[in-house]
Amino acid sequence: VQTLAYLSKEKNAFPALVIAPLVTLTNWQREIEKFLKKKSRNGKIMENKHPSSVMIRNGKQSDIDESDFYIINYELLHKRLPDLLKLNIKTVVCDEVQHLRSKTTQKYAAVKKLAAKDGVKFRVGLSGTPIYNRGSEIWPIVDILKPGLLGSYKEFCEYFCYVNEKGKAIVLENKRDSLRNQLTKHVMLRRKKSDVLKELKDKVRYPEVIASDEKFYRAELDKIWKKLEEEQKYAQTAFDKSASYHRAIESERQAAGLAKLPHVINFVNDIMDIEESVVVFCHHRAIHDLLHQSLSKYNPASIIGGQSDKRRDAEILSLIHI
């Protein structure tokens, strides 16, 4: 929303290209319609009209209709690059910009070309984690948003980094403050939750130990162990052995989840009895299905892999309005 507000105040910011993870595309389109209004030629707000938006979901090359916003996921960029280069884009927005931390990927090369177009006036990157473990991953991102700020990659590494035994460039500890100052001075607006949510209460964590059916778990673990020994005995390659271990690990995780399930259901019921909201995360579809079935009287929203975009969006909306 902050990005949309910024673009609405800038002159000649449209058309804008929004590049984002696949699961957030519909949300971008929804927020555009919710928060932005169309302006008339004389600059007046038109209450009943919104900026137009096109969501690009097909990898097949074809001309793209004119629009105020073009929304596409990172994975389709290189396939639709020729079509996107034809557009008169004025702004490039990269949501979860850490996707561009590797300068050798196809999506990085595509964004680099799009952001370097003569008509592009604004480049915006959004991320909660722009700097990863080594620190040097920030260079490709900054070189798209503000080319030349950190010099060439070689110059950046020579000044800010050392190279470890694996050949990876890592930002020196005594250079971190200097790099942070350079970024916040020229290109990075760092906002903490405490800065933007003044009225939000501090998060409080109460760890609760959930009981489990230990007898069931040990019986399942015994079956998994015997099956693993059998598979290892007849494994012909290192790949077969590795795959067998992975299957055993997944089976153990599911057994642990099933052993806790009745107690988790009781725990959720107790919370619901005092009319509090609950979010439950689970790893396996089988456990998800059992949870959903057992707690169906609360009509819970359910977000899980394999859902259609339409179904997932409907579930997200129902979750928001709970």
PLM features per residue range, with description:
Residues 1-4:
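Walker A/P-loop
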Residues 14-31:
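Conserved Walker A/P-loop ATP-binding site and its immediately adjacent core
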Residues 60-70, 313-319:
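Conserved motor-coupling elements within RecA-like helicase/translocase cores
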Residues 71-76, 82-89, 106-121, 126, ...:
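Inter-lobe coupling linker of SF2 helicases/translocases
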Residues 95-96:
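Walker B catalytic acidic pair
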Residues 139-151:
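A short helix-turn-beta junction within AAA+ P-loop NTPase domains corresponding to the substrate/partner-engaging
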Residues 282-305:
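Conserved helicase motor "Helicase C" RecA-like lobe of SF1/SF2 P-loop NTPases
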Residues 298-320:
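Conserved helicase ATPase core of P-loop NTP-dependent helicases/translocases
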